[in-house]
Amino acid sequence: MNMQRILVYSDKGVSPYYLRHTVRWLKQAAFPFQMEVCRVNGQFLIHEPLWEETTQLLVIPGGADVPYHHVLHGLGTARIDNYVREGGAYLGICAGAYFGCAHFSFLEPNGSLLVAKRDLGFFPGMANGPAYDSAFSYTSSSGVLAASLRFTDFPGKSFALFNGGCYFENAEDFSEVRVEARYNDLPGSPAAIISRRLDRGLVVLSGPHIEYLPEFCSLQEENVVHAREQIAKNSAGLEEYKQTLIKRLLSNVVEHVLY
């Protein structure tokens, strides 16, 4: 099959800012693979015939999970689950990671606690967020910081942008789940990025915004400038991880069986 596309979800709830970073990073990273990066909405994933046959990777970027659920719950998530199990790859970043978990709890900016179940359940446990006690907001960058990460396969200090993402509770207790990175500066160093082989497919869920490219960030809020500088100076481990990650995601099993 001719699988030469990366689909990036772009519908209600997706942050335009993080969508731009996601698409820019994917276009750079996927260039050697000669794959097209396409933005798609929920109706496409629900109704477009046979998109699975030409798609190597589906990316659900940052934003707000609840609108994702409203649009994709049912037929959309069923097709995504089948796509992955039949050999596809799924990358969920921040809200896309919450969306890929069986359960999550999220402290909303107004102080209310959202506890919810989700269809995909790629991570079978609970995702909790925001992982850091920062002033998260859906409408500003007030909660942005540089998260200190410790990668399983890449030693050394590294930072990634954080803005409301989760940690994966007791991820090490699930034998089918691999912890790819931990929050180095949180109590107990909980899992920040996890992966899982699901039948013939591959899932990667990331609490922090690993797609963020500091050289393309012009925001001038003090906390964002500080985070950007930290990430730019301490990104060797993150960059190594991202290079390996994209190869894994784009080199996964390419044969899909559609029923």
Curated annotation (Swiss-Prot):
<dbReference type="InterPro" id="IPR019197">
    <property type="entry name" value="Biotin-prot_ligase_N"/>
</dbReference>
<comment type="similarity">
    <text>Belongs to the chlamydial CPn_0128/CT_035/TC_0305 family.</text>
</comment>
<protein>
    <recommendedName>
        <fullName>Uncharacterized protein TC_0305</fullName>
    </recommendedName>
</protein>
<dbReference type="Pfam" id="PF09825">
    <property type="entry name" value="BPL_N"/>
</dbReference>
<dbReference type="InterPro" id="IPR029062">
    <property type="entry name" value="Class_I_gatase-like"/>
</dbReference>
<dbReference type="InterPro" id="IPR015834">
    <property type="entry name" value="UCP016642"/>
</dbReference>
